[in-house]
Swiss-Prot record:
Protein name, per record: Arylacetonitrilase
Activity over temperature: Optimum temperature is 38 degrees Celsius.
Keyword flag Hydrolase: yes
Stored InterPro entries: C-N_Hydrolase, C-N_Hydrolase_sf, Nitrilase/CN_hydratase_CS, Nitrilases_CHs
Gene3D superfamilies the record matches: Carbon-nitrogen hydrolase
PANTHER family named in the record: ARYLACETONITRILASE (PTHR46044:SF14), NITRILASE (PTHR46044)
Reactions catalysed: a nitrile + 2 H2O = a carboxylate + NH4(+); 4-chlorophenylacetonitrile + 2 H2O = 4-chlorophenylacetate + NH4(+)
Family assignment from sequence similarity: Belongs to the carbon-nitrogen hydrolase superfamily. Nitrilase family.
Highest taxon above the source species: Eukaryota
Length: 337
């Protein structure tokens, strides 16, 4: 844990410039500067903030024109756009947890990364399993994405996206890395409308999952959402219920599950600020430490394979490595070798 027990955070509740990478990067840098100017040491962004969540996928199964536009406006790590964001973090000496549609070649992934206050990318991951219609746009991750918690001067910061918060094994692996501040990234979250719509995709469901995560992990949870306005409805030709305006539900949740912040209006852009007292984590984990004294590893334990599985492997490695099995000594190069 950081030597200082007080951390000021800025949780965004803003609207991206939909399907416009350059303009959304401009806005990202402005928000970084504003948050730092208000004393924040950490700023968080929602799922697929860059270039906005592809909400049309829930309205129709295929839209090749929009997909092509979306691909061309998704963010590559090795790009001037990413360098601008990293430079903004360094200039303003603030940690950034970013949500992005990650472009790797001609494939897309729901990505998250942490940029430290020197501008270095210290964590990058992909959503383990895109949810339902998301699979028409995004690919899956591999083992490296399980390493989603990083130790920073402000504390141990981790991140998951959307319905990863109902994946018990993934959650436990995140918690067991010693997480203290957790970024819970979502797109927009509207109040449940009744009928056949899934409660778990609603504001109540997303907020509830984030509060349960706080309880289970005894960590601070920064629930981060976007705002959906009429420009998005028009650009993506959205139909009910996805044409509903608003969707902002950003919040800061304490390690015991309570909300620490008042909500902004759902259709209003702004920051949710909070000053975290990390000593509260110690108090909560004294009662419940699910990765320590409140566990039974003699009876229940989690197996994990954090190796990255690539599309091309040297002869002799392919069969075993593809399934996460051990390979003969000397056949696997150490990462970075």
């Amino acid at each position: 844990m950081t030597a200082s027990t007080k951390v000021r955070v800025a949780v965004t509740q803003h609207e991206p410039v939909w399907l416009d990478l350059h303009a959304t990067v401009d806005k990202t840098c402005r928000l970084i500067a504003e948050a730092a100017g208000n004393g924040a040491q950490l700023i968080t962004f929602p799922e697929c903030w860059l270039p906005g969540y592809p909400a049309w996928i829930w309205c129709r199964p295929v839209d090749m024109g929009l997909f092509t536009t979306y691909l061309k406006n998704s963010l590559s790590y090795d790009s001037e756009h990413m360098r601008r964001i990293c430079n903004a973090a360094a200039q303003h000496k603030i940690t950034v947890v970013l949500g992005l549609s990650e472009r790797d070649g001609n494939s897309l992934y729901i990505g998250q990364c942490t940029i430290d206050s020197t501008g270095k990318i210290v964590m990058r991951r992909r959503k383990m399993k895109p949810t339902h219609m998301e699979r028409t746009v995004f690919g899956e991750s591999s083992g490296r994405s399980l390493l989603n918690v990083v130790d920073l001067p402000i504390g141990k910061v981790g991140a998951l996206a959307c319905w990863e918060h109902i994946q018990p094994l993934l959650k436990y692996h995140t918690m067991i890395q010693g997480e203290e501040i957790h970024v819970s990234a979502w797109p927009v979250l509207h109040p449940h409308m009744g009928g056949e719509s899934l409660w778990g995709m609603s504001q109540e469901g997303g907020t509830g999952a984030s509060q349960v995560y706080a309880l289970e992990s005894a960590s601070f949870v920064l629930l981060t959402t976007a705002v959906l306005g009429p420009t998005c409805v028009k650009k993506m030709n959205l139909s009910p219920p996805w044409d509903t305006l608003g969707g902002g539900a950003s919040a800061v949740i304490a390690p015991d599950g309570r909300r620490l912040t008042e909500p902004l209006p759902a259709n209003e852009e702004g920051f949710v600020y909070a000053d975290l007292d990390l000593d509260m984590i110690l108090t909560c984990r004294h009662f419940v430490d699910a990765c320590g004294h409140y566990s039974r590893p003699d009876l229940l334990w989690l197996g994990v394979d954090t190796r990255e599985k690539t599309q091309h492997r040297p002869e002799g490695q392919a069969d075993n490595a593809a399934y996460g099995l051990d390979v003969p000594s000397g056949l696997v190069e150490e990462e970075g070798a």
